[in-house]
């Protein structure tokens, strides 16, 4: 069974036991969170929400918090000998999916 969930403005296809990296959540490492924004359930029983499936929830464990790889933003203005280099690292939360309940 799989589910499509929404968290942090993005959608993820998850199965039990999967590890996903989502936008940073306010939760302690090792704690459990419940995601009730389930857009679709698939597998044996197929159901699509409008916008969310009622009564469906996904339970996940917070594995760790971290920062992604550095992205380089480089801007250059021609004929001015002007340029700007800036780096960015996005915070993330790693989740391990424990259970999908329909």
From Swiss-Prot:
Any one of the GO CC terms: ribosome
GO function terms (MF aspect): rRNA binding; structural constituent of ribosome
Ribonucleoprotein listed as a keyword: yes
Function: This protein binds to 23S rRNA in the presence of protein L20.
UniProt keyword annotations, A-Z: Ribonucleoprotein, Ribosomal protein, RNA-binding, rRNA-binding
One BP term from GO: translation
Subunit: Part of the 50S ribosomal subunit. Contacts protein L20.
Record PANTHER family: 50S RIBOSOMAL PROTEIN L21, LARGE RIBOSOMAL SUBUNIT PROTEIN BL21M
Stated name of the protein: Large ribosomal subunit protein bL21
Family note: Belongs to the bacterial ribosomal protein bL21 family.
A Pfam family matched in the record: Ribosomal_L21p
SUPFAM superfamilies: L21p-like (SSF141091)
